[in-house]
Regions:
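Charge-rich, low-complexity amphipathic helices
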Residues: 70-71, 125-126, 172
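Active-site nucleotide-donor binding segment shared across nucleotidyl transfer reactions
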Residues: 97-148
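Extreme N-terminal basic, low-complexity initiation segments
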Residues: 2-6
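Conserved catalytic core of two-metal-ion nucleotidyltransferases
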Residues: 88, 92, 96-98, 151-183
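Short, glycine/charge-rich beta-strand/loop segments that flank catalytic centers
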Residues: 83, 112-124, 161-170
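Helical scaffold of the NTase/Pol beta-like nucleotidyltransferase catalytic core
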Residues: 12-24, 29-114
């Protein structure tokens, strides 16, 4: 069971709020505790005004409540959010496969990070984990090769590729013409 933090100075930043803790429990546990947490959460919020972190959990909530046979008018809205997440993730995963394939064909090792790693490694369902972009780690000695390969493909960056600057940053944002991002 997730508990909210008493550290009020961080609520909304690094610790879960009481509402987020209720939602996380509703999305992750099974049986009556899950249903109870969901009812408490649903009765204490306005669905149109949930915070971003909570909104990202709604697809996982939908899957958990569906597995438990919950019927409620809000289930259709949760389903719509789940389906949108699944669709967006399909597009991002296709883009990810393309980039990883291109880098692999040039003997550049990659490691998936964050959401894409979670989806591939832990979730069987691409709709339960919301992603806005995907993240790939490459060997530091191949960074310039990666930048050149990406620049010759559909991906571009606004980042200055000055060697001295690259040493002091943890990532570079790339974007395609469709507005899809990856770091």
């Amino acid at each position: 069971t997730v508990r909210s933090s008493n550290r009020m100075e961080c609520v909304g930043e690094c610790w879960t709020s009481p509402h987020q803790a209720m939602l996380l429990n509703a999305a992750r546990v099974n049986g009556e505790p899950s249903i109870s947490h969901w009812r408490q959460w649903a009765n204490s919020i306005e669905l149109d005004n949930v915070d971003t972190a909570s909104h990202r959990l709604l697809p996982l909530l939908y899957r958990n409540l569906t597995r438990q046979g919950v019927e409620h008018p809000d289930m259709d809205r949760y389903k719509g959010i789940y389906r949108r997440t699944w669709y967006r993730n399909q597009i991002l995963m296709h883009k990810l496969q393309s980039v990883v394939g291109m880098l692999g064909s040039h003997q550049i090792d990659t490691m998936l990070l964050k959401g894409s790693a979670m989806i591939v490694g832990y979730y069987a369902d691409h709709g339960v984990r919301s992603m806005n972009d995907f993240d790939i780690l490459v060997p530091v000695h191949q960074v310039h090769d990666v930048i050149n390969l990406l620049a010759s493909s559909e991906w571009h960056t606004e980042f200055p590729t000055v060697a001295s600057r690259i040493r002091f940053t943890h990532s570079m944002l790339f974007q395609d013409a469709g507005g899809h991002d990856f770091d």
